[in-house]
């Protein structure tokens, strides 16, 4: 599993760095757990102000450490890796690498929750058919009329749908322009 992670992560890092037009400072560290329960019991990052969780709430990020678990599904594992890599890159891109830079930048940069979560989810999963169906259901069945209402119901899906639209309409090169 560690060898698989190394091979996949190398390709995914290059792919995501190209999408964001940004090279990571330093190295990634991947901590892999054999199952979800081991992952949930981990105390890595507890008490750290630097602890983030991604959109699924399951990939922990501590600095450049990405904590993931393997549940028997390589597709899901790869999504966790991509989400973790995207989160680390976005954190470095927006807030800098050191704790001091992050504190200084956090006061200046304030993106809505759906914006970053949607981007991370889009990078990790793309726009699968079930998202299309879920969005259609919210609009038709639940009567969601506009983007703000969608953000209230499902902010991650709202952000993911926005990034899907932007990339489909204007191309992947626009991602870095909208983040900087």
Predicted regions and their residues:
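Active-site-proximal alpha-helical
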Residues: 16, 111-132, 136-180
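Juxtacatalytic substrate-recognition/specificity segment
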Residues: 1-106, 112, 129-130
């Amino acid at each position: 599993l560690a060898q698989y992670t190394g091979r996949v992560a190398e390709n995914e890092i290059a792919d995501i760095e190209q999408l964001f037009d940004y090279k990571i400072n330093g190295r990634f560290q991947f901590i892999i757990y054999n199952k979800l329960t081991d992952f949930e019991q981990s105390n890595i990052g507890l008490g750290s102000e630097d602890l983030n969780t991604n959109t699924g709430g399951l990939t922990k990020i501590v600095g450049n450490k990405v904590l993931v678990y393997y549940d028997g599904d390589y597709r899901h594992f790869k999504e966790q890796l991509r989400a973790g890599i995207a989160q680390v890159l976005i954190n470095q891109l927006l807030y800098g690498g050191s704790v001091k830079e992050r504190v200084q930048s956090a006061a200046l940069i304030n993106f809505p929750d759906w914006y970053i979560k949607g981007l991370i989810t889009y990078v990790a999963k793309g726009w699968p058919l079930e998202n299309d169906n879920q969005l259609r259901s919210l609009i038709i069945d639940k009567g969601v009329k506009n983007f703000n209402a969608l953000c209230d119901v499902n902010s991650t899906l709202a952000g993911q749908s926005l990034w899907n639209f932007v990339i489909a309409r204007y191309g992947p090169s626009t991602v870095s322009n909208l983040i900087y």
